[in-house]
């Protein structure tokens, strides 16, 4: 991977808004290098990492909420597999709003095949909320995802 260090760094950013966490919600996002027809030669793309941060709130009294934010990636064999989890949770004694937040970076280092100059690099991801206890319609979550890519001509 040392030969990638001189390659330009590019990011791909997404925001997933979950206004309610009832029913194990999920959203699909696509990581893209947006380099179609911008270079004169074919290129390779290295998907370096996926950084995830989130914040959210929940309402109620004597509430214990917890779950997992699952990030999955559609792999080359067509199967969507988890790349990692970030715990969500909090406890609240009084009838009020509680808050939770978290962050994590997943190192991927996935190298693409050579791409023609007239095609974009694309990789699908699924952002899912897994309910372990109490995540419901009185809970919300906003997730921020940044993919780091390196482009090599």
UniProtKB/Swiss-Prot annotation:
Q: Does the keyword S-adenosyl-L-methionine apply?
A: no
Q: Where in the cell is it found?
A: Host nucleus; Host cytoplasm
Alphabetized UniProt keyword annotations: Host cytoplasm, Host nucleus
InterPro entries xref list = Nanovirus_C8
This molecule's function is given as:
Putative nuclear shuttle protein.
Entry's family note: Belongs to the nanoviridae nuclear shuttle protein family.
Name recorded for this polypeptide: Putative nuclear shuttle protein
Cite the source lineage: Viruses, Monodnaviria, Shotokuvirae, Cressdnaviricota, Arfiviricetes
Gene name tied to this protein = DNA-N
